[in-house]
Every structure is written in C-alpha cells, then in structure tokens.
Amino acid sequence: MLHRIVALVLVLAPTVAEAQLCEGQSAAISADGRAFGHLPYGDAPESELVTLPSEYSVGNPCVVRADMLPDLLRLFAAAQGDPSVMGQLRALSCQRSIARQRSVFCRGETSSAADRAISVAPPGYSEHSTGYALDFAVRPANGCPDAEACMAATPAARWLRLNAPRFGFEQSFPGGNKQHVKWEPWHWRWVGASGSARGAAKARFVFSRARRLYPADPGVVPLVVKFSAPPPLPTPVAPPPSRSKKKRR
C-alpha cells in the first residue's frame, strides 16, 4: 500500500521543465519560460536570410533577415557620414542558428552552464537565432576588445544610442535590466522604425514578450497619434424679444 501511495505522489508531483544544453547538461526553465534569464527563440527560415555586403562586417559573413537589411545599410551609411562617430561601425556577429549557438555555448564546458550563460545565451535562447539581432563592432578598436563594456565609452557607441532607434534598432540588454542578462551595449535588435515598415510587424511579434516585460533602452518608441479636440462651437444666443409699440387711440 505504501509503495502505491509513493508512486501516486511521484505521478502527481509537478515536474520541473528543463532545457537541454550540452551533452549531459540541462538548465531549469523558469515559470516564464526563461533559461538563465534568456527568453526562448526559434531559428529564422533560411529563405528569409541574406548576406550583408562584406565591407560592412568583420570576421565571418554577416547573415540577417532580408527585411532588416535596408535599415541596417542606411544606419551604416549615416554613421559613415557623421564625423562624430570618429571611426567605423561594423557588424561583428549576426544570425546564428540554434545548432551554431550550441557549439559556441558548449565549447567552454570547463565552467558551469550558469557561468557561461552570463556572456553567451544558451542554445534556443538567443536573439541571434531570429536573424533580427546583431552585435556591432568599432573600427579602429583603439584598445577596446570586441563585445566588451568599454565599447559604451566610444563615440560610435554614443552615436548608436542617439541614432539607432531612427533606423528601427533598439538595445536589447541595457544596464540593470530586469531580465538579469549581462549589459551588452554592442547587442541590438531590429523591430522597424514604425509598425508599418516592411517586415516590422513580424519582428515585433517575435520580440513582443521581451519588449513588453523587459523594455529595451534605448528603444523604438511606438508612434502615438494625438488628436486635439476642436474648439467648441459658440452657442447661438436668441435675440431678445422685440417690444411692440402700442398704438395711440
């Protein structure tokens, strides 16, 4: 009888969902679906990906969503024409498939998964897999390694904060974010400058949960149309009744 009760308790007990990371490693998934603070994302369809011209990237070829490419090229052109940037912005890391993310995340298995997740999102939990996110680099680097906090002090990074939202880009992980993800001033995602921009609705749907629960900073502010009420029409005033003159008899 006791064995039956124990078995029943085990069946009815709530199971803890886990994300499979590396071989023999897993991570508990929180109630809101996050693993080590990161939200889940799927792979971008290959048919929707294009390669950024090589002159705008460093290292491996940069692959992004086709809908995002025009705004990214306009951003690079604007930065290149602004002397305040004092350098050149380049794409460092763009779309990464879940399989590629797994190889990146698991290559440092000497440390714990929790420690690695501070700087690298677990496979299946990276914005890079969507094709809408990228890491920027500055050239010349002037002693600041790529993907390090020192980038925030560069003129190019300051230019990004002031101007990137005009091109539909927002900083996913600002300092002190409630998502408890490492501050990444180099990491930006595209959601379109307006909801009517081509492909923006799809991108905003992909990031809808992140944008609602953990707002970007700077973020792309949604357009709010305000209508001013027309001035009230004057109330017509009835003319005073005319006094009829009495006729003399």
Predicted regions and their residues:
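Extracytoplasmic cell-surface/polysaccharide-interacting catalytic and binding patches
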Residues: A17-C94, I98-R249
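Sec-dependent signal peptide recognition
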Residues: M1-L8
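N-terminal signal peptide c-region/cleavage motif recognized by signal peptidases
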Residues: L12-V16
